[in-house]
C-alpha cells in the first residue's frame, strides 16, 4: 500500500501491475532521452554563434525528423497495446464477483454461491482499532483466493464510481446501466487497499476498498462460514 512521501508506484501484486510498471519505466526512459536531447539542442542554439543563413532546405534532416519520431511512437505503442490486450483478456475464471457502487459504499455478490453477498462501509475514525488505517478500513472485506483468475463485474446503482486497487493495477469505472469487467489475480496473500477514484458526491473520499487475498483452503472455509 502507499505510505507518506512515497514517490514511486506501489509494489506490484499482480502480473498486470508488473507489466504496467515495466511499461512505465520503458516510457519514462524514452521521455528522459528525448528531453535531454531537446535541452542539449536548445543550449547549443543559445550559445553557438554559427548559423546557416544560406540553407534553403535540408531533405535529409527532414526525413530523419519524420521517421525517427514515428519509430519512437511505435516503440511506445506496441507494449501499450500488448498490456491493453492482457487487461481485457480473461480465461476460465474460477470465481465471479459482482461489485455495485452506491453513494457512498460498495456492495459485493459472489455469483457462484447462493446468498453470499454483503455491503462494505468505511469504518468511522472513532471506531478504529489500534493499527488500523484511517479512511481505508471497512466493516466487510472482499475475501478472494490468491494465484487464481477472478472476474469482477462492476456497475453502479446511482452515479459514476470507479473501483480501483493500485497495487493490483485495477481501475474500472462503475457506470449505471452498464456492466464492466476486470480480472483480479494476486501473486501473494495480504490486504490490498483502494478507493473510489471517480468524484461521486460529498462523501466520495469515504468509499474505501479492501481485498483480502488468502490461499484457496482459507477462502473455502470463509465462504462456508458466510453461507
From Swiss-Prot:
GO terms for biological process: ATP synthesis coupled electron transport. This is Cytochrome c oxidase subunit 2. NCBIfam families: CoxB (TIGR02866). GO terms for cellular component: mitochondrial inner membrane; respiratory chain complex IV. GO terms for molecular function: copper ion binding; cytochrome-c oxidase activity. It is found in: Mitochondrion inner membrane. Its EC number is 7.1.1.9. Mg(2+) binds at residue 198. CDD domains: CcO_II_C (cd13912). It catalyses: 4 Fe(II)-[cytochrome c] + O2 + 8 H(+)(in) = 4 Fe(III)-[cytochrome c] + 2 H2O + 4 H(+)(out). The chain crosses the membrane at residues 15-45, 60-87. It comes from the Eukaryota. The modification Phosphotyrosine is found at residue 218. Binds a dinuclear copper A center per subunit.
Amino acid at each position: 500500500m502507499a505510505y507518506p512521501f512515497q514517490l514511486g508506484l506501489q509494489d506490484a501484486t499482480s502480473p498486470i501491475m508488473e507489466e504496467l510498471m515495466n511499461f512505465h519505466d520503458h516510457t519514462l526512459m524514452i521521455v528522459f532521452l528525448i528531453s535531454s536531447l531537446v535541452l542539449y539542442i536548445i543550449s547549443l542554439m543559445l550559445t553557438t554563434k554559427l548559423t546557416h543563413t544560406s540553407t534553403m532546405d535540408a531533405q535529409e534532416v527532414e526525413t530523419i525528423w519524420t521517421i525517427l519520431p514515428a519509430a519512437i511512437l511505435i516503440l511506445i505503442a506496441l507494449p501499450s497495446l500488448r498490456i491493453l490486450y492482457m487487461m481485457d483478456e480473461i480465461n476460465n475464471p474460477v470465481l465471479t464477483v459482482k461489485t455495485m457502487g452506491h453513494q457512498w459504499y460498495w456492495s459485493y455478490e459472489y455469483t457462484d454461491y447462493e446468498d453470499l453477498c454483503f455491503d462494505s462501509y468505511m469504518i468511522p475514525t472513532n471506531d478504529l482499532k489500534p493499527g488500523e488505517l484511517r479512511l481505508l478500513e471497512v466493516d466487510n472485506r472482499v475475501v478472494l483466493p490468491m494465484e487464481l483468475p477472478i472476474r469482477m463485474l462492476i456497475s453502479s446503482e446511482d452515479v459514476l464510481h470507479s473501483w480501483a486497487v493500485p497495487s493490483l493495477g485495477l481501475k474500472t469505472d462503475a457506470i449505471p446501466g452498464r456492466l464492466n469487467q476486470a480480472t483480479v489475480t494476486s501473486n501473494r496473500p495480504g490486504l490490498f487497499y483502494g478507493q473510489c477514484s471517480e468524484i461521486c458526491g460529498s462523501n466520495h473520499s469515504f468509499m474505501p476498498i479492501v481485498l483480502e487475498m488468502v490461499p484457496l483452503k482459507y477462502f473455502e472455509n470463509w465462504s462456508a462460514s458466510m453461507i
